[in-house]
Amino acid sequence: MIPSDHFTRFYNEVFKFLESQGEDALEAYWLAISRNQERHILELIETQGLEGMHEYWSHIRTEENCDMDLDLDADRLELRMNLCPSLSKVMDNDAEPMGRYCDHCAGWIGPIMDKTGYHMVYDVIDRRKPQCVLRIFRDPDRARAAEKDAQLLMGWPGRKVG
């Protein structure tokens, strides 16, 4: 198995290559990642909803040693990444980070939320700082209201912003 610090650097180079091939190539890759991730999260969402998402990201928090806070209420899950280990590893590298590295998270999570009827608001805040806020809502009106507070709102394949 490839160590995570090598994996994220490899991912960064793959993203840069695909970006050089055009937006369609990059989005196709993100959609492939999304389909793969369905094996890990789709059943949790379909059977447990927001609680299943909370379970999934709690496991990721431990597995990837993330400095993140999770907050769950009846209509919303908020994931506040205080220090993203993935972007941190990419930035601690002699190769230039892909300018849109953070976009891959929305690129795989967004299509799953669309598929399951949830509404995602993904605020990267600043692509050069390893932090973000992901909010997932049951209610589309609450999601639209939350979008107004985002500093750098992300889109994903099938949902463009801006």
Report residues per predicted region:
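N-terminal accessory segment detector
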Residues: M1-D103, D114, H119-V133, F137-G162
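ATP phosphate-binding glycine-rich loop and adjacent ATP-lid/helix-beta elements
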Residues: H104-I109
